[in-house]
Amino acid sequence: MDSIPVIDTHQHLWDLDLFQLPWLDLAGMDVLRNSFRMTDYREATRNCPIIKSVYMEVNVHPDLQRQEAQYVLALCEADDNPMSGAVIGGSPGESSFADYLDEFAGNPFVKGVRTILHDPDRPRGMCLTPQFKENIRLLGDLGLSFDLCMRPAEIQDAVELVDACPETRFIIDHCGNMSVQPDQQQDRAAWEAGMWRMAECDRVFCKISGIVATATPGTWQPADLKQNIDFCLDTFGEDRIFFGGDWPVCTLTANFESWYRALLWI
């Protein structure tokens, strides 16, 4: 099994000398308040058969989104690392988004856009404004995808957005962000219903990523992740799921190799 080549579809990097990441100031983020560069990623994955990776935007300060995109696209162009594409940051709720996107949409390394919907200052329904929907439809016109990263209780918002953008591909990050903690299951019914509903649309894909960060540091076991992962496999089927390492965010609870090997066990 270890010999199967792996594409990591959710690779983060950040250089705190270049970028401001406001969310690193939140409680519990101490281990992430460092720079994480390509050399660090290669060391973290050296015992795993990663052959390619796709950069995932890191929720930089909005004023730095253009600079972040330029930075990672330069890495994609280099031949000394596995990065072969990027999902760049952007602000689809803003009228300036179309002009911003025009700068990058022709770059073959740009695969899609993400904006985080679950930050504390981002209210429910943020992705349902007319401006937001218009800009997500624009992504579809350009052959680009949109990554959904939101609170599990609000997944019905994603259903409405998908329905409103019939030509756009969507990727659900982190299995829909449903926690694996037994005492945090109050949103499970809404999450399951929303995931089933989105799985009915063949333009929606599910990324097996991120959920290890909701496990208990130091004591978690692969079995703790199995219920959520099995649900996603059963709901979307093997042709519409893929792996994302979510490094270095996964290091809140696990190193890359232990997370990867947990998935092999599952």
Question: What is each model feature region?
Answer:
Residues 66-154, 160-163, 176, 207-211, ...:
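Active-site gating/metal-coordination segments in enzymes
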Residues 63-82, 162-172, 222-234, 257-266:
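Short, electropositive alpha-helical surface patch
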Residues 3-5, 48-54, 80-85, 106-111, ...:
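Short, well-ordered coil/turn segments that N-cap beta-strands
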Residues 1-74, 261-262:
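An N-terminally biased module of ancient metal coordination in phosphate/nucleic-acid-related enzymes
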Residues 11, 58, 175, 246-247:
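Active-site metal-binding loops of divalent metal-dependent hydrolases
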Residues 180-182, 186-266:
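H/E-rich (His + Asp/Glu) clusters that bind or coordinate divalent metals
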Residues 10-14, 149, 174:
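Histidine-centered divalent metal-coordination motifs
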Residues 1-4, 42-43, 96-107, 156-165, ...:
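Short amphipathic alpha-helices and their capping/turn segments at secondary-structure boundaries
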